[in-house]
UniProtKB/Swiss-Prot annotation:
Plays an essential role in the switch from lysogenic to lytic state and in fine-tuning the lytic phase activation. Mediates the de-repression of the lytic promoters from repression by cI at an early stage of prophage induction. Turns down the expression of the transcriptional activator cII, a factor that initiates the expression of repressor cI, the major component promoting latency. Additionally, cro is able to directly bind to the promoter region of cI thereby preventing the transcription of cI repressor. SUPFAM superfamilies: lambda repressor-like DNA-binding domains (SSF47413). It comes from Escherichia phage lambda (Bacteriophage lambda). It comes from the Viruses. The gene is cro. One of its GO terms (biological process) is negative regulation of viral transcription. This is Regulatory protein cro. One of its GO terms (molecular function) is DNA binding. Pfam families: Cro. Keywords: DNA-binding, Early protein, Latency-replication decision, Repressor, Transcription, Transcription regulation, Viral latency, Viral latency initiation and maintenance.
Length: 66
């Protein structure tokens, strides 16, 4: 059964070091993403594997009129 959880909640539960290891990134990247308030969700699969997806508006860059 898949479980979906925010990056912040996963890191609070398991620690930033384990979170980084599970996602294949550095701990500093986890810390920076959390402090920046990025909307990142982790899916935990039944086999224990974890992957992350970021949700952000499209288009992400709002163009200003000149």
């Amino acid at each position: 059964m898949e479980q979906r959880i925010t990056l912040k909640d996963y890191a609070m539960r398991f620690g930033q070091t384990k979170t980084a290891k599970d996602l294949g990134v550095y701990q500093s990247a986890i810390n920076k993403a959390i402090h920046a308030g990025r909307k990142i969700f982790l899916t935990i699969n039944a086999d224990g594997s974890v992957y992350a997806e970021e949700v952000k508006p499209f288009p992400s860059n709002k163009k200003t009129t000149a």
